Regions:
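Conserved metal-binding segment of the jelly-roll/cupin
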Residues: 107-125
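His/acidic/aromatic-lined binding-pocket segments of jelly-roll/cupin-type domains
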Residues: 66-69, 104-105, 113
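A short hydrophobic beta-strand segment most commonly corresponding to one strand
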Residues: 128-140
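Short hydrophobic/aromatic-rich beta-strand segments that constitute the beta-sheet cores
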Residues: 49, 77-79, 132
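Short, conserved beta-strand element in jelly-roll/cupin
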Residues: 62-63, 67-83, 89-98
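A short, N-terminal "cap"/entry segment at the start of jelly-roll beta-barrel domains
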Residues: 4-6, 13-63
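Short, surface-exposed beta-strand-loop junctions and turns on beta-sheet-rich folds
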Residues: 83-85, 129-130
Length: 140
């Protein structure tokens, strides 16, 4: 448990330190963290706790680097390659149905994956559920 707290703290601290220079201190009480959802936002940063119980769609973000830190559970994530069946869902946001030529990686508790902007990624298999921090760093 101590390792989880330390890793979580380091991950959050690193992200917040890389936020805008005039950022204010953000305190998130344990009760809020336990509920999941949005923990902190800044002009070039967002931190959330996500939960998945099933596979999602392929995602590509033109200006967002995603860092996932797995809190509990497991999943298979596919990264890289080429998105299939892509549609624009918003400025710089794209979703698709499959990835051709990507690399599959099993994620489990304690794992971290950093997905640079522009790289397709997809939770292809979620056997039961997965809880994870999402730190998004948004390029200007």
């Amino acid at each position: 448990m101590k390792r989880l707290i330390v890793a979580s703290t380091l991950l959050l601290s690193t992200a917040l330190l890389n936020a805008a220079e005039d950022s204010k201190v953000t305190y998130v009480p344990a009760a809020t963290v336990a509920k999941g959802g949005s923990l902190a936002t800044a002009p070039n940063l967002s931190i959330t706790i996500a939960n998945r119980k099933e596979p999602g769609m392929v995602e590509v973000h033109d200006k967002e680097t995603d860092t996932f830190y797995v809190l509990d559970g497991s999943a298979t994530i596919v990264t890289g390659g080429t998105m299939v069946g892509g549609t624009d869902t918003g400025p710089g946001q794209h979703r698709g149905t499959d990835i051709k030529g990507g690399q599959a990686q099993r994620l489990a508790k304690g794992d971290v994956v950093v997905i640079p902007a522009g790289v397709p990624h997809w939770f292809k298999e979620v056997p039961s559920s997965i809880d994870y921090y999402v730190v998004k760093v948004i390029a200007e």
